[in-house]
Swiss-Prot record:
Keyword Amino-acid biosynthesis among UniProt keywords: no
GO BP term (any one): translation
PROSITE patterns: RIBOSOMAL_L3
Classification via InterPro entries: Ribosomal_uL3, Ribosomal_uL3_bac/org-type, Ribosomal_uL3_CS, Transl_B-barrel_sf
Protein name: Large ribosomal subunit protein uL3
Subunit-level organization: Part of the 50S ribosomal subunit. Forms a cluster with proteins L14 and L19.
Coiled-coil stretches noted in the UniProt entry, renumbered to this chain: none
GO cellular component: cytosolic large ribosomal subunit
Length: 212
């Protein structure tokens, strides 16, 4: 895994490429993320760096959290994330990770939390087909059969049913970076990202899985 950055989703807009075509993009306010801890095989059993993001008031953190951040002389920050690396010799405590680690045209993976929809039914949550809407039908939005009868005499785990929808971790892979603005700590990514405006997102270089 390679080092990434944390940011806040600001919202969506559009830009125009060299051919004049409209490109939908999401604007992310990313970093700077100071390094708060460097983990090594001798002390932790693996190699990684921990970064912080999102300044808060000191009273919003517990005493152990403040003590942990003070070791790297980092101001009070809300979020901590780890990025596993093969070699951490190029990093040191307090070093800031900024958006200039990315470049236009690069592919990235973005991880965030999807918008919570609350308790949702079968059609909205799983795209079930509805029943007849006329001719005396009483099955409009019912699920249909949930299993067999006496044998097995139960509903198998994993059966798609109504329940809470959204508010889960979502990773969208291989999105293209359109522009990077180091002065304003902005990164423009093609397409939609998970979560509402103001949501926390993690951006890492794309991990190639299977065919490109």
């Amino acid at each position: 895994m390679t080092v990434g950055i944390l940011g806040t989703k600001l919202g969506m807009t559009q830009i125009f490429d060299e051919a004049g075509r409209s490109v939908p993009i999401t604007v992310v306010q990313a970093g700077p993320c100071p390094i708060t801890q460097i983990k090594t095989p001798q002390t932790d059993g693996y190699t990684a760096i921990q970064v912080a993001y999102g300044e808060v008031r000191e009273k919003n953190l517990s005493r152990p959290e403040r003590g942990h951040l003070n070791k790297s002389q980092t101001p009070p920050m809300r979020h901590l994330r780890e990025f596993r690396l093969e070699d951490v010799s190029a990093y040191q405590l307090g070093q800031a990770i900024t958006v200039d680690i990315f470049s236009p045209g690069q592919l990235v993976d973005v991880r965030g939390t999807s918008i919570g929809r609350g308790f949702a039914g079968y059609q909205k949550r799983h795209n079930f087909k509805r029943g007849p809407m006329a001719h005396g039908s009483k099955n409009h939005r019912l699920p249909g059969s949930t299993g067999a009868g006496t044998t097995p005499g139960r509903v198998f785990p994993g059966k798609r049913m109504a329940g809470r929808m959204g508010n889960t971790a979502v990773t969208i892979r291989k999105l293209q970076v359109m522009r990077v603005d180091p002065e304003r700590n902005l990164i423009l990514i093609k397409g939609a990202l998970p979560g509402k405006p103001g949501a926390l997102v993690s951006i890492t270089p794309a991990k190639v899985v299977g065919r490109k």
